[in-house]
C-alpha cells in the first residue's frame, strides 16, 4: 500500500467527530491492506512502532524533526522553528515546508517511486534503533530521506508520528471493531485474543492471514491485560455480591505489577503493559530466588518501604524509582517489597481458567517467601463482622483496605466485573471514594493563571459504548507547578474539535485527545443537566456531576483512559451515598 493512501485515511479519521465513521474508514483501509503490511498500518495508527512492552522509542524531539525537514526542503531551520512557535504543530510545519520548499523537477518527481507503508515503517524502525556516536545525524539523514520523497500531506503525518503527536486518539476497541468488520471475525473472539496477547499489530496480521484465533495463547514474556475490580462500601454488600463467601486480601498502596519468569530471566510489566524491570532490579533478583518454577506469570503489588523502619510508604515514593539514572541510589533510599496475589501460568499450565482458590494454593506452592517477596495477606470469610475486622487490621498497617474476591472465580483478563471488589478506607468520605477521570477539555486561565489552563473538563468512561462522558469541571487543588505540568502534558494532545469518543454539552476553550488521567475527590455526586455522564440513569434527561471537585495531586500515569472510573461505577456511588446520613 502506498503511504499516501494511508495518509488520506488518517486525515479523514482526524476530521470526523463520529465514531461510526471512524470505524467505516478503518474497515475499508484494512480490507485493502496486504497481510504483510497490515501490522505496520495498525502500529502507525496507534502512534507506536511496536507493542508497549518492547519499549521501542524513536527518540526524536521537535528540533531534530525540524532539522530533517530543513535538510529535505532547503528551508532554514530558524524559519521552520518560527513556524512551529506559531502553530505548535510540527506536522503542519512539515506540510507547509514540503509545499513551499525546493522540490525535484517535474520529470524527476514523476519518475520518483511513491512511498510505501512498509518503506516508511522500516525507515522509522531504523531511526528508533540508531544509537551511539553519530546517532542524531543518522536520524536526521533517515528522516530527511522520507521527507524529500513525501507529499505535503504525507509529510504532515510522518512528522507528527516521529514526535509522538499523531493526535488521532483511535482506541484499541475501535480498531478491533474495524478488524472484525474487515475480516468477518467475531468481535468477541478478537477481544478475547487481545486480552491474552494485547499486540494489535500482531493480531491484525493473524486475522488477515486467515489464521484461527485459538492459536493465540497466554505466553510468558507477553503481558496479558489485567483483571480489574468493582467497588462497594460495606462488607455486607460485598458478601452478598460474592455469594456469601469471599477471599479478602490486603490492598497494598503500591504499583501493580505483572511478573514474567522465563528461561532464567525476569520481566516486570506495569498495568499499562510497559516494561518497568529497569526500575526494580532488586525485585527482579528477589523473584528469581523466590519463585520455584522454570516459567511463570504472577501478579502482585510493588510497595515502597522505609529503609529504617520497614513500614510501608505511599505509592508516590515509588516515582523515585522511575528515573533511568541513579537507580542504585533510589534502590537504597526507597527499597521495595513485592506482595504476590495471583498466579496465572506456571510451567506450561494456563491457570486463568482455574478457580481463584486453586490459583492461591498453587501460588503458595511455587513461591518461597522471604527477603523482598511475600504472598499478600489474605483470609476467607463468610461474615460481615469478620470482614470488617480484617479491613480495620489492614488499614491500621498502612494499606488502602481490602480486595475481596470470589473463591470460585476464574481470571478474567481485561474485565472489570463483580468477582473482584475493592473495599477501601476512602469509602468513609461523603463522596465515598476518589475517582480517576480523563481530561477531555480545558478552560483558559485568568489572572495568576493567565497563559495556562485554569480549569479542566473531566469525563468518565463507558466501556459499553467505548465513549467518555463529562462529569465535572475542576479548577481546585492545583498548585502553580501542577498547572504548568498539566499544560505541558496536554499541549501535545490538543485538537481543533471535540474528540469523536467524547460526549459533552459543555464547550471548553480547548479540546484534547482523551489520554491524561487524574485523581479527583468531591463533596458528593449530584444530578446535573449540564453533564452527560449517565444521562437518564437516575432521572430522565439529567446526568450526574461531582459537586465541589478537587484535584488530589495524584496523576494516574499508571492508567490508560479506558482504566478510568466508569459511568456505571458513578451511578452506583450516587445510589450508595444516599444511605450515608448527613451530620
UniProtKB/Swiss-Prot annotation:
Disulfide bonds: none annotated. It comes from the Archaea. The active site is at 251 (n6-amp-lysine intermediate). Its cofactor is Mg(2+). Its EC number is 6.5.1.1. Keywords: ATP-binding, Cell cycle, Cell division, DNA damage, DNA recombination, DNA repair, DNA replication, Ligase, Magnesium, Metal-binding, Nucleotide-binding. ATP binds at residues 249, 256, 271, 301, 341, 416, 422. It catalyses: ATP + (deoxyribonucleotide)n-3'-hydroxyl + 5'-phospho-(deoxyribonucleotide)m = (deoxyribonucleotide)n+m + AMP + diphosphate. InterPro entries: ATP-dep_DNA_ligase, DNA_ligae_ATP-dep_bac/arc, DNA_ligase_ATP-dep, DNA_ligase_ATP-dep_C, DNA_ligase_ATP-dep_cent, DNA_ligase_ATP-dep_CS, DNA_ligase_ATP-dep_N, DNA_ligase_N_sf. GO terms for biological process: cell division; DNA biosynthetic process; DNA recombination; DNA repair; lagging strand elongation. One of its GO terms (molecular function) is metal ion binding. DNA ligase that seals nicks in double-stranded DNA during DNA replication, DNA recombination and DNA repair. Belongs to the ATP-dependent DNA ligase family. This is DNA ligase.
